[in-house]
Amino acid sequence: MAIRKYKPTTPGRRASSVSMFTEITRSTPEKSLLRPLSKTGGRNSHGHITTRHRGGGHKRRYRVIDFRRNDKDGVLAKVAHIEYDPNRTANIALLHYFDGEKRYILAPKGLTQGTVIESGAAADIKVGNNLPLRNIPTGTTIHNVELKPGAGAKLARSAGASIQLLGKEGSYAVLRMPSSEIRRVDIRCRATVGEVGNAEQINIRWGKAGRMRWKGWRPTVRGVVMNPVDHPHGGGEGKTSGGRHPVSPWGQKEGRTRKPKRYSDDMIVRRRRANKNKKR
């Protein structure tokens, strides 16, 4: 994916860049695979904010993605188009199965229009093919990996993400995650060969607040500039430092949010490396 940088004709364009969409072969999505997508504005069913800084943005329609591919084993499919999906960072590929059905999948790097792919234990080790982990050779780069057999892919689904299959131990496969964490997964789980495409998406600079509003992101306001009624750090005469250790608007102390005794921790062989550049 090529990235286009604008000339600095305005302050907003000076720092902005956009994708050239060179891999996209069709601009209109498949109508039968679209679903309505209503916005929540970051609120739950009670109207309470559960995710801050969300709201507005361009109207979208959800593209139904096949994250399982287990009911099409042995059926060949031809890549009809590579399309843009506003709901995710990765591009999507429209498959025309030889039995007449159409489905979307995540577009791996190197998958082009006209390529024939398949799924199942007997499929070749080829970019875009979907197989159980027990049938994939050690050292293969994979993505779209399941955590539970038949539950659909949960791991390595964003643009440029990939997982390496390090080995197989009994009924488990050992995987190196994008975070460098090494964990075990049931060997019956399925994965797709290759890495997710559109890897340069991370290099796009949005340039101005307006483009983030188009994407549905609202401003982030510091607690120290709020009133005391709105944030524990708010208030004070003049410019203050907050007067206490950093907390959330609800008084929750800043720090790690992951559960220390999560049930899936037993599958972790080695923790991910700490970010050395993180300020402490």
UniProtKB/Swiss-Prot annotation:
InterPro entries xref list: NA-bd_OB-fold, Rib_uL2_dom2, Ribosomal_uL2, Ribosomal_uL2_bac/org-type, Ribosomal_uL2_C, Ribosomal_uL2_CS, Ribosomal_uL2_dom3, Ribosomal_uL2_RNA-bd_dom
Keyword set includes Ribosomal protein: yes
Domain of life: Bacteria
Cellular component GO terms, alphabetical: large ribosomal subunit
Pfam families: Ribosomal_L2, Ribosomal_L2_C
PROSITE patterns: RIBOSOMAL_L2
Gene3D superfamilies xref list: 2.30.30.30, Nucleic acid-binding proteins, Ribosomal protein L2, domain 3
Keyword RNA-binding applies: yes
Residue ranges, compositional bias (Basic residues): 45-58, 270-280
Positions of region (Disordered): 29-58, 225-280
Composition bias type Basic and acidic residues, residue spans: 253-269
GO biological process: cytoplasmic translation
One GO MF term: rRNA binding
Keywords noted in UniProt: Ribonucleoprotein, Ribosomal protein, RNA-binding, rRNA-binding
Family, as annotated: Belongs to the universal ribosomal protein uL2 family.
Function as written in the Swiss-Prot or TrEMBL entry: One of the primary rRNA binding proteins. Required for association of the 30S and 50S subunits to form the 70S ribosome, for tRNA binding and peptide bond formation. It has been suggested to have peptidyltransferase activity; this is somewhat controversial. Makes several contacts with the 16S rRNA in the 70S ribosome.
Assembly with partners or alone: Part of the 50S ribosomal subunit. Forms a bridge to the 30S subunit in the 70S ribosome.
HAMAP family in the record: Ribosomal_uL2_B
Protein name stated in the entry: Large ribosomal subunit protein uL2
Annotated source species: Corynebacterium glutamicum (strain ATCC 13032 / DSM 20300 / JCM 1318 / BCRC 11384 / CCUG 27702 / LMG 3730 / NBRC 12168 / NCIMB 10025 / NRRL B-2784 / 534)
Lineage of the organism: Bacteria, Bacillati, Actinomycetota, Actinomycetes, Mycobacteriales
Gene name of the encoded protein: rplB
